[in-house]
Each structure stands twice: as C-alpha cells, then as structure tokens.
C-alpha cells in the first residue's frame, strides 16, 4: 500500500494533552514538529488548509496533516478539529 503518515505541528511549551492523546492513538506513523523551535517558524502563519506543495503549508498550533503518497490529503487545524477529525 501507499505510505500514509501524519505530521503533528504543535508548541511543545503549550501542548494540549487531549490532542496529544488522540495523536498518540493513531495507527499510522506520526512525525512531530515543534512550532516553538525557530527552525520551524517558516511553517507558522494563517492556516493554509490542504496545499499541493509542502512549502506553501502554513499552520497554527496545534495542527495535524495527513499525507498519502507524498500529497497532503487532510488538514486539521485547532484542537477541536483535530479531535473530531482523527477520532
């Protein structure tokens, strides 16, 4: 099958435990990106939603994206949307 994975963008200094537990329960691989780290600040901005090019991606904390075959297929922004979208 095609590789499916998630990327969890969040501020490690202000993590929502209810979101973390939903993310931790996912069956597919999850990559975590710390938005508190200046190295990742290029991702932060007005949430872009699903984009074709990862370089156009903008997120706020917390956000989860779902990636399949190198394409973003879902974008969940904010804790409520993540919890509803991933459960």
What do the PLM-derived regions correspond to, one by one?
Residues 1-32:
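Local sequence-structure signature of Cys/Sec-based thiol-disulfide redox active-site neighborhoods
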Residues 35-56:
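An anionic, turn-rich surface loop/hairpin at beta-sheet edges
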Residues 21-24, 55, 84-87:
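Surface-exposed alpha-helical segments enriched in charged/polar residues
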Residues 1-4, 52-58:
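Short, surface-exposed loop and linker segments with low hydrophobicity and enrichment for Pro/Ser/Thr
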Residues 11-15, 37-40, 72-73, 81:
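Short acidic, S/G/P-rich loop/turn micro-motifs used as interaction or catalytic elements
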Residues 31-34, 68:
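Small/flexible residues
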Residues 58-87:
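Non-catalytic, surface beta->alpha helical segment in thiol-disulfide oxidoreductase systems
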């Amino acid at each position: 099958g095609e590789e499916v994975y998630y990327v969890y963008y969040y501020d490690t200094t202000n993590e929502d435990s209810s979101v973390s537990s939903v993310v931790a329960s996912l069956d597919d691989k999850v990559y975590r990106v710390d938005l508190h780290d200046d190295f990742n600040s290029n991702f932060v901005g007005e949430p872009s939603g699903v984009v074709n090019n990862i370089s156009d991606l903008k997120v706020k904390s917390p956000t989860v994206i779902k990636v399949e075959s190198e394409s973003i297929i879902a974008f969940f922004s904010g804790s409520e949307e993540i919890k509803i979208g991933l459960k």
